[in-house]
Amino acid sequence: MDELAGWQNGYDSKVGAKLVKEMIERDVNHPCIILWSNGNEGGWNTQTDPLFAQYDRLQKRHMVHPWADFNDLDTHHYPTYLTGVARFTNGYKVFMPTEFMHAMYDQGGGAGLRDFWDRWCTNPLFAGGFIWVYCDEAPKRSDKGGILDSDKSNAPDGVVGPRREKEGSYYAIRAQ
């Protein structure tokens, strides 16, 4: 999934339109992109929704709004185990939480994954899920001799490190 990154608020239409176009032109041929996400954490601008189809004319990938039932997908973040089961029992949309496990701050992205996976994978409405966050966010600091600054425990700690080295969460997830 390729996300029009933001935080709580969506971009205004002028800025959002420019960013959608740039993102799709940059990533349209990337083999791992199966969905476009118009925002994150509740922030999106519905006026930019049509631009995803306009710029992705060839593959016409789905565009989603995280945390929402939108475009035939239920992408709610961080559902509990039983919430997911209820969505299968009572729902009719494909369920694919755009964030459902948390590896940040090395909270063990694989902790509890087997329980979710064993139950959820038995239902045809389940299409998988996304773990936050893939890699450590550690900018290279030119003012500090080129060190990778992860701000101690205040920066996201992902499944892999800032140099893509495998961390504990990687092995826990891989074992699932």
What are these model-predicted stretches?
Residues 166-176:
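Surface beta-strand/loop "capping" patches
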Residues 1-168:
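Substrate-binding/catalytic cleft of secreted carbohydrate-active enzymes
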